[in-house]
Design a protein with these regions (language model features):
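Nucleotide-activated chemistry modules centered on ATP-dependent adenylation/adenylyltransferase
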Residues: 1-35, 43-170
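Aromatic pocket-lining residues of Rossmann-like dinucleotide-binding sites
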Residues: 40
Length: 170
């Protein structure tokens, strides 16, 4: 039976009452962030983590980051709480090592939503989870499942695996 992640989220939000817990949101770009921020900002203190070493070339990485930076002040009237942004250094070697491209060069030619993407989702989500845990965030999530180009089912499975790693959150 498929999970209703929207129902689970709604139940979580209802259980929060007036509390606004901290949430680390891994974001891939501004467009995918907009709905998530609008929906969740009323209920959480959100910090965005822009960690995307998979984006190539570096100019595209920087363009997406700049779009996110430019987007946040324009979007402020629609959000309920101030959003923080954490930027990471561009390091594509981390990505190549994580997906093991040297051992599996065929991954470079896989279509969207294939094994390379699954490894990429896992890598970035693990980094976000680790950051959230190290910095005492109460929750973490990603915008990746919002994108029509990504495999939401794989992303949700990976999210559940991370959730099961620790009973103490994030």
């Amino acid at each position: 039976m498929k999970s209703s992640y929207q129902k689970q989220l709604d139940e979580l939000i209802t259980s929060l009452s007036d509390k606004k817990p901290s949430l680390l949101l891994h974001a891939c770009c501004a467009p995918c962030s907009s709905y998530v921020l609008e929906y969740l900002s009323e209920h959480f203190q959100i910090t965005i983590l822009y960690y995307n070493p998979n984006i190539y070339p570096q100019t595209e990485y920087e363009r997406r980051l700049q779009e996110l930076i430019d987007f946040l002040p324009k979007f402020e009237p629609a959000i309920k709480n101030k959003i923080q942004l954490i930027q990471t250094e561009y390091n594509p070697e981390e990505f190549y090592n994580a997906i093991d491209i040297k051992t599996n060069p065929e991954l470079a030619f896989e279509p969207e939503r294939g094994e390379r993407c699954r490894r990429c989702y896992k890598f970035r989500m693990q980094k976000a989870y680790d950051y959230a845990k190290q910095n005492n965030f109460e929750y973490f999530c990603t915008t990746l499942s919002i994108s029509p180009f990504k495999d939401a089912e794989k992303i949700n499975i990976l999210g559940n695996e991370l959730q099961n790693l620790s009973e103490s959150g994030p």
